[in-house]
Amino acid sequence: MGKSLSHLPLHSNKEDGYDGVTSTDNMRNGLVSSEVRNEDGRSGDVSQFPYVEFTGRDSVTCPTCQGTGRIPRGQENQLVALIPYSDQRLRPRRTKLYVMASVFVCLLLSGLAVFFLFPRSIDVKYIGVKSAYVSYDSQKRMIYLNITNTLNITNNNYYSVEVENITAQVQFSKTVIGKARLSNITNIGPLDMKQIDYTVPTVIAEEMSYMYDFCTLPSIKVHNIVLMMQVTVTTAYFGHSEQISQERYQYVDCGRNTTYQLAQSEYLNVLQPQQ
């Protein structure tokens, strides 16, 4: 009994020591196994999403992979791209430069539009009488004058101008002796000038029949009478109409058919009303 009692504590101590070592090892093994399980779990999670490379027509270029990655075609609206905050695409360069350039281009185009489309004057210059053809009615003591006049119309605009009509009348001694109207005449191009002739038929009769004796008097070589030429030119551009009027006093020979040169016509244009 003594030996058995003496060995029991030793045995128990050994067993306790063994159990302590075993428990310590078990704890270490438990920690290791738990870490292994965690790593296995992570590797299992990663293994659920294997690396797949998409090539060919079934994929498109990934916009966040610098053009080197591919994503399945048809999933562009389902996938979300994560872009780093420091990505250059989130901070575009030269934004101020682009804005200033856009503003400058807009201002330049606006200035050019205003410059070219701004309405400028249309100049009408009465050149004079080009020709006068005379005929008489001796029974009624009437004089018929077909007077052809010349106008220069200058378009100072950078777009075409339409000459809609020309209205003219001739006065003798404050009495209107002839009228004429021409419609849909011509178009004048940008920065262009056109010369237009128009004829006004006139009749001198009734209370002015005394002029018949003057115009048919054979002792006088030149039978000049003073006529006032009035002309109104109507032009149109961009739906806007504009009228320009001119008045000139002109010598006309009522004794014979006469063709005037432009220089002579200018010389005869001496009696003008004071403005």
UniProtKB/Swiss-Prot annotation:
SUPFAM superfamilies assigned to the protein according to its UniProt record, in alphabetical order: LEA14-like
Entry-linked Pfam families: TMEM106, TMEM106_N
Topological domains, Lumenal: 119-275
GO cellular component: late endosome membrane; lysosomal membrane; lysosome; plasma membrane
Presence of the UniProt keyword Nucleotide-binding in the record: no
Glycosylation sites: 146, 152, 165, 184, 257
Domain of life of the native organism: Eukaryota
Keyword check for Coiled coil: no
Residue spans crossing the bilayer: 98-118
Segments on the Cytoplasmic face: 2-97
Subcellular location: Late endosome membrane; Lysosome membrane; Cell membrane
GO biological process, one term: dendrite morphogenesis
Membrane topology: Single-pass type II membrane protein
Family designation: Belongs to the TMEM106 family.
Role description: Involved in dendrite morphogenesis and maintenance by regulating lysosomal trafficking. May act as a molecular brake for retrograde transport of late endosomes/lysosomes, possibly via its interaction with MAP6. In neurons, may also play a role in the regulation of lysosomal size and responsiveness to stress. Required for proper lysosomal acidification. In neurons, involved in the transport of late endosomes/lysosomes. May be involved in dendrite morphogenesis and maintenance by regulating lysosomal trafficking. May act as a molecular brake for retrograde transport of late endosomes/lysosomes, possibly via its interaction with MAP6. In motoneurons, may mediate the axonal transport of lysosomes and axonal sorting at the initial segment.
Record text on subunit structure and interactions: Can form homomers. Interacts (via N-terminus) with MAP6 (via C-terminus). Interacts (via C-terminus) with the vacuolar-type ATPase subunit ATP6AP1. Interacts (via N-terminus) with AP2M1 and CLTC. Interacts with TMEM106C.
Protein name per its UniProtKB record: Transmembrane protein 106B
The organism's taxonomic lineage, starting at the top: Eukaryota, Metazoa, Chordata, Craniata, Vertebrata
